[in-house]
Amino acid sequence: MEGLDINKLLDISDLPGIDGEEIKVYEPLQLVEVKSNPQNRTPDLEDDYGVVRRNMHFQQQMLMDAAKIFLETAKNADSPRHMEVFATLMGQMTTTNREILKLHKDMKDITSEQVGTKGAVPTGQMNIQNATVFMGSPTELMDEIGDAYEAQEAREKVINGTTD
């Protein structure tokens, strides 16, 4: 046992596969302050839309790439767990597709709506579409519709199928 050198035993430089490569150290994340324009939200809206859309498409591409790998792995492994992981990934891809379409709908809704800022002066114009307006006195309205109790009774009769 005298010929045993602990330093020689701990030296792993001659083991195959060990090249002494340096491990890449990533720089810490530096957060950047986002500029906001509360008086003119159009640039903010366009920037945010671009960021969200880009992120969703990148996510979709990564999911598709992973799906190809996972499908082959699931086929080769013949394992229910691998198929379950693949099915979960497919569900996530479907969700991302829906979110991309929802983003377009939301953007359309946002851009078609007229949003004013705090300092904006109201124009006095009102745009009402598909509104039913009753022209008459309150008594005539009560005769037409009835009070809240009568209206509730009428709804219950319709629901229960006991209309007269």
Curated annotation (Swiss-Prot):
Region listing for Oligomerization, in residue ranges: 36-114
Chain spans, region Interaction with gp17: 1-35, 115-164
DNA-binding recorded as keyword: yes
Name of the protein: Terminase, small subunit
Domain of life: Viruses
Pfam families for the chain: DNA_Packaging
InterPro entries: Phage_T4_Gp16_DNA-pack (IPR020342)
Gene3D superfamilies: ESAT-6-like (1.10.287.1060)
Example of a GO cellular component annotation carried by this entry: viral terminase complex
One example GO MF annotation: DNA binding
Residues annotated as transmembrane: none
Function: The terminase small subunit binds to the packaging initiation site and regulates the ATPase activity of the terminase large subunit. The terminase lies at a unique vertex of the procapsid and is composed of two subunits, a small terminase subunit involved in viral DNA recognition (packaging 'pac' sequence), and a large terminase subunit possessing endonucleolytic and ATPase activities. Both terminase subunits heterooligomerize and are docked on the portal protein to form the packaging machine.
Helix-turn-helix (HTH): annotated segments: 1-35
Alphabetical UniProt keywords: DNA-binding, Viral genome packaging, Viral release from host cell
Domain description: The N-terminus contains a helix-turn-helix (HTH) doamin that is involved in viral DNA binding.
Complex and partners: Homooctamer. Interacts with the terminase large subunit gp17; the active complex is probably heterooligomeric.
Keyword DNA-binding appears in the UniProt entry: yes
